[in-house]
């Protein structure tokens, strides 16, 4: 599954364009699609019951980074604060890969762990992201 705006650049005949709000059925499972740009313009998350597969949008302890071509910190703020953090706090996130102290975490627990999820507004988030990048080491 790929976000609909990336359909022309994905070189495969095995693709299914999706958009925000779509329900994708895989066998007996139904996943809701959330378009969550910021890390990349075509980033998506998938909600399955009380599990959110966040890809590179949200990790345990932090958000995705916005240092690549096409990344946008303001878009990431909107995706995280107006989409993901609006979900029930007991939702468990499953990131695309492991960068945190554990593999999965609830939204509420992640908020308490990460300054990036405690920003007062978009400007504070941008400041927190810049601070994270400036203090970043190979380990984090």
Q: How would you name each of these model-derived features?
A:
Residues 36:
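Hydrophobic alpha-helical positions that pack around
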Residues 30, 41-139:
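Metallo-beta-lactamase
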Residues 11, 18-20, 39-40, 78-82:
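A generic local structural motif
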């Amino acid at each position: 599954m790929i976000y609909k705006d990336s359909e022309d650049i994905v070189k495969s005949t095995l693709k299914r364009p999706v958009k925000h709000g779509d329900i994708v059925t895989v066998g007996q499972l139904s996943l809701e699609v959330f378009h969550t740009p910021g890390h990349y313009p075509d980033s998506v998350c998938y909600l399955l019951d009380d599990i959110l597969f966040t890809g590179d949008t949200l990790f345990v302890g932090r958000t995705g980074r916005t240092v690549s071509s096409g990344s946008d910190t303001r878009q990431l703020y909107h995706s995280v604060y107006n989409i993901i953090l609006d979900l029930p706090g007991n939702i468990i996130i499953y990131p695309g890969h492991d960068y945190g102290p554990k593999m999965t975490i609830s939204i509420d627990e992640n908020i308490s762990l990460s300054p990036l999820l405690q920003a007062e507004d978009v400007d504070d988030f941008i400041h927190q992201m810049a601070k994270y990048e400036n203090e970043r080491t190979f380990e984090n």
